[in-house]
Every structure is written in C-alpha cells, then in structure tokens.
Amino acid sequence: MIHLKKIIFFLIFSILVSCSSIPKNTQNSCAIFEERYLWYKHAKASYEKWGAPIHLQLAFVKKESDFDWLAKPPRKKLFKVIPFKRPSSSFGYSQAVKGTWEQYKRETNNPLATRVRFKDSVDFIGWYIHKTNKILRISKKDAYK
C-alpha cells in the first residue's frame, strides 16, 4: 500500500514538474516574478528563514542554471565525439551536487526536497548562504566573494 502511494505521488509530481518552463525574460527579476508569482513567495520565504537577499538568490539561479529546472553540466567527450560522464552530480535550478543536497535535506529535516523544485532550490540557496556566512563570515549581501 505504501509502495503504491509513493508511485502515485511521484507520477503526480512528475506531471506537475514537467509543466514548468523557463521564464521569458530571465534578465529582469520583476518580469520573472510577474510571470511566476509563487516564485516570489518562495524566494521571500527563504529570505525570511535564512536572511539570504532575494536578488542574491536569483543571481545564484541565473548563474548556475539560467532558470532551467533540468540543467546539468555538459557531458565530457570520449575521443572528442562520444558523450561520456558528466563532471559532477549537480542538477536543477541551484546546481547543488548530490552530497551537499543530502546534507541540506538532513540538516533542514526536509527529506522530500528535490533539486527541480524552485521552492526547494531557493531554500537550499538560502541555507547555503547562511552556512557560508556562519562558517566563513562572508556577508549575506556580498555577491562577489
């Protein structure tokens, strides 16, 4: 019974996630939030929880994945022709690698978080900025360090 519920959950989740597309204008945060109002709510919630500025969260997503929810690093080429392994396990909006993502899920007690959900990705970015601030003493508002 539990196995069936998991399958149904992942089928519904897959259908809903596949409806996501890249915003039309990724250069303008106001245009992004006009097009995707829930993204603003998620980014604001991450700001309130972790103190990571919304503009910095969007800068991370823009730089890492250009708002492509299925972004992955390009494959290496074998003999300069045959697609081979990817250089890392980074994936999704935040391009979080698997190990760091697992640490985030453990520390935030959020085992259902996925790298393809914008909500989870901006929460991860907020958590990451918060951890960086705590450990390295880099300002949460400093996008250049």
Describe these PLM feature segments:
Residues 2-3, 45:
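Hydrophobic transmembrane signal anchors and adjacent membrane-proximal interface regions, especially
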Residues 3-12:
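Sec-dependent signal peptide recognition
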Residues 12-13, 71:
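Enrichment for repetitive, rod-forming helical segments
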Residues 17-18:
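C-terminal motif of bacterial Sec signal peptides marking the signal peptidase cleavage site
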Residues 21-145:
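Catalytic glycan-binding domains that act on GlcNAc-containing polysaccharides
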